[in-house]
Amino acid sequence: MTAFPSLFVSHRSPTLSVEDCAASRYLQWLGPQIRDTLGTPEAIVMISAHHDGAGRFGVTTTAAPTTIHDFGGFPEALYRIQYRPPGAPELARSLAEGLRRRGFDMFEDELRGLDHGAWVPLRLMFPDADIPVIQLSMDMRASPDRHHALGNALAELQAAGVLVIGSGSATHNLREFFTGGFRLDSPAPDWVRGFADWLAERIEAEDDDSVLRAVETGPQGQRNHPSLDHILPLFAAMGAGGEGAEGLRVHTSYTYGVLAMDVFGFGDPPSSKGCPIPRARSAPPPMKVYANARLVPRTPRTASPPLRVSLPCGECEGGQGHSERRRLSSG
């Protein structure tokens, strides 16, 4: 079974799903590229900036997630958009059980659908909505390290054919956005570009400690992230790459000046070599190539118990699924 990378995507606002820009074109390219090079994921676990468990981590267990229009003041057409992939309740409950064994206080939500932090990038990447989706909440009261540990507990899902995606924003200062008079194509100020480039450099240097303290110690960190909600999914995605996985910024662009639309891959993201982003109104920015990244061993952390993952199996009677224990190799 294919081992998928974990990804972090910047989702901006619901208008990304209908506006033509380098970031939307990249996500439209990325989904098919994943299918072509790695295969179709068995399921997707989304960690969105707009799902806060308010003191706990949680997982959606609905079989048919609805589309949540959790925004106001946008064009009416956005409220008519429906993105309705199937859920994966058995996998979600198995995931919750495994995370509890790892010390996470988990709740299960049978009613919640997909907020725009989930469905906006998924609709661009996988428009057919044919891959089961689970949404995992953040806990805004928990530390960056705790979210990184949550992601690390999800690392085995890669080897089970599950794609883990954190969805937030590489930079996210809405006060500057609303008061700065920025347009869609406004150039990024130095304080935005400087932080985004520093963040990418630290990720590619595998400097996890600096990344986890980015808001505190990065250049203009607190100005770029007045709150942690849109960077916490990055920490989870970074952890989900697994021990020793390389991280790389696979896309960079800016919209409305202050919003860096970076996409990061952790593990072995697909290569863009020989497969350019489809052209639209303007040429996309250059992309780095990430092909068959070597997993560089790091100093191992304290071993955790294996996460039991239950996936549907066509060989099981009644399609009930079975459990598998998997570990990622760091070599």
What label would you give each PLM region?
Residues 97, 101, 142, 156-163, ...:
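Surface-exposed, charge/polar-rich loops and edge strands
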Residues 5-9, 43-49, 136, 157-170, ...:
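Beta-strand elements within well-structured catalytic alpha/beta cores of enzymes
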Residues 275, 313-316:
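Cysteine-centered motifs
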Residues 290, 320-322:
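Low-complexity, intrinsically disordered or signal/transmembrane-proximal segments
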Residues 2-102, 106:
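A short aromatic-anchored loop/beta-hairpin motif
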Residues 92-148, 153:
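Internal, conserved structured core segments that host functional sites
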Residues 23-31, 145-160:
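Long, well-ordered alpha-helical scaffolding segments within enzyme catalytic domains
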Residues 325-330:
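Short, intrinsically disordered C-terminal tails of secreted or membrane-associated proteins
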